[in-house]
Amino acid sequence: DTPASKNNAQLYCTGTVNCEFERWNQIKIVNADNHRVSREAIREKVVRLKRDDLNEANALFLSVPAGQHELVIRFYPVSVDRAETLHVIHRFKPAERYTFRMFRARSRHQGSLLNMSAPDPLCVDLKQNQRTIRRFCKPYNVLNGLGEFVEQKL
């Protein structure tokens, strides 16, 4: 860390087999095909290593200047073969820790057997330090299996 980066926001992702930061603003971070960190991300000094072992899941985090930024995160809830992608624009505050945590929202199903058989929605909480400040959920569409992450009221 440098004196300038002490005020950076730290961004983490967790909750799944693996998660990767795909892009921060225009800077590509981790390649989706080979799962390698881009030279640009290293040159811009936004990538940090959380643990000693790069082979551990979720070993990377970002250290970024405060302000409004676009972030794209790939979560792998079941396996590393299938990613769920979240696009977020957020105003990050200086020297704060932000964690994007994916989970499956357990719900009491009501209605038809078809609706009841659908998997529970995938959700991502954005936590600032320990407090959840935003939530995005991706309901399962019974007809085509596809859905988009939509911000929920907290």
Residue positions per predicted region:
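Short loop/turn and low-complexity linker motifs enriched in small/turn-promoting residues
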Residues: D1-A66, R74-L154
